[in-house]
């Protein structure tokens, strides 16, 4: 691994510090909880929409989320390692055949829908078993501290 890649990995680990970024791709519907500063206080605002693109790599990686707000299309670009992002949650997986879904900008209503990627029962069972196992391990590790 070259020096720049090592430094980027180190910085990414420092920026994440306890946060986990789920695996998501264009076509997935995500909820991004963003920290918004209003005067003295800070609050968390949820922004839900379809991820239409992922750009860059390493620390500069970003993604674009599009939603329809009061009949008007709104797009917002987020840096993955931004300290302003509180959390990212994947609501549903989309089945698409493109990396950039910019064609959704021209579509309205039913033509802008994205088919949901269905998970096989076996894959779902293994995912849930891993989730339970991780939860149990976390629960067992907590009293030891």
UniProtKB/Swiss-Prot annotation:
UniProt entry keywords in alphabetical sequence: Ribonucleoprotein, Ribosomal protein
* Function as written in the Swiss-Prot or TrEMBL entry: This protein is located at the 30S-50S ribosomal subunit interface and may play a role in the structure and function of the aminoacyl-tRNA binding site.
PROSITE patterns associated with the record: RIBOSOMAL_L19
**Region span, Disordered:** 114-145
User: What SUPFAM superfamilies does this protein's entry cite?
Assistant: Translation proteins SH3-like domain
Taxonomy of origin reads: Bacteria, Pseudomonadati, Pseudomonadota, Alphaproteobacteria, Hyphomicrobiales
Which InterPro entries does its entry note? Ribosomal_bL19, Ribosomal_bL19_CS, Ribosomal_bL19_sf, Translation_prot_SH3-like_sf
- This protein is called Large ribosomal subunit protein bL19
Q: Which domain of life is it from?
A: Bacteria
Q: Which family does it belong to?
A: Belongs to the bacterial ribosomal protein bL19 family.
Q: Where is the composition biased (Basic and acidic residues)?
A: 114-136
Q: Which HAMAP family match?
A: Ribosomal_bL19 (MF_00402)
**Which Gene Ontology terms cover its molecular function?**
structural constituent of ribosome
Q: Which GO terms describe its biological process?
A: translation
One cellular component term (GO) for this entry is: cytosolic large ribosomal subunit
Indicate whether Ribonucleoprotein appears among the record's keywords. Answer: yes
